[in-house]
Amino acid sequence: MKTIKNLILIALLCISVLGCKKTEEALEPSAIDVQYKLPQGNHDYDPALVTLNQKYGTFFLYKWNAVDFASNPVYIAGGFNETYTADIADEAYVGKVLAFVQKNWLNHYSDAFLKANLPFKVLLGQNLRMKASATTNYTILSNYNQITLSNFSADFDAMTDAQKKTYVNNIHTEFFNFIFNRGKLDIPTEFGLVTNYTTAASATTYYSLGYVSYVVALQADKLNKDFLSYIALITSKTKAELDASILKSTTDTGGLIKKKYDIIINYYKTKYNIDLQAIGNAGVIN
């Protein structure tokens, strides 16, 4: 009898436990918090910034902070964050300078190239400078996952034509430097076969060896820096200016500069649908 009572008690306890069990709600994944939200305001230029983000996945920001500017996954003593600083853009000038930047930078490259090579963020700012010397200013700098453009302020209106040309030249040069620093620089194989990088160069022989910069001819990592020096030259000079200088037979005595020039131009036209010489020919588009 005692055994039967115990069995009945156990059964009642089981029923009680089952009756009290709560039904758990289905688990749903939590929403991912996006670091930057666009638009940042309601200016007439904000839709253009949203469109750029949708096309390329890059955040063009006129509101940002010191962490956005200087963050780097690896601390380096005396590195970017300890060397440079900048201020956020004057919002009254963002529309004007953005239009200038689009015409003189982004419009020269294919959408596919920009999507693959633009940084995670482009910071629109002003007073881009060295921390140790406020008078040492820059128009563009890049770091880790960002490019910062300066003169989004009244300084833009104060620029001379020559200064605007330098501004544009620096954008293209730094863009390719950024691509190189990310390990994504695409150098045609044929380009690296023209110059013998083991041959010592001098101030009187570097042109004949196929260099366009004597400084590069003396540095390490010659192939990458040689290619970047060609890019900087091509995108900053008209074809007529190049024909009258480094492509002139009395300068390019070995014909190697012209050979390397042609390799770059044809490669980027064929593979990326980008006419690098057209950038140099365009000069400044206001």
Language model features by range: what are they?
Residues M1-I8:
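Bacterial N-terminal signal peptides that target proteins for export
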Residues I15-G19:
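C-terminal motif of bacterial Sec signal peptides marking the signal peptidase cleavage site
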Residues K21-D111, A244, T250-N286:
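Acidic/polar, low-complexity intrinsically disordered N-terminal segments immediately downstream
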Residues D87-L98, S142, T160-N169:
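Solvent-exposed, acidic/flexible segments
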Residues E91-N145:
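Auxiliary, metal-adjacent structural segments of Zn-dependent hydrolase domains
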Residues L123, Q146-S150, S229:
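Structural recognition of the beta-strand scaffold that forms the well-ordered cores
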Residues I147-T195:
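Active-site recognition of the HExxH zinc-binding catalytic motif
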Residues T195-N286:
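Metalloprotease/metallohydrolase-associated module, dominated by Zn2+-dependent proteases
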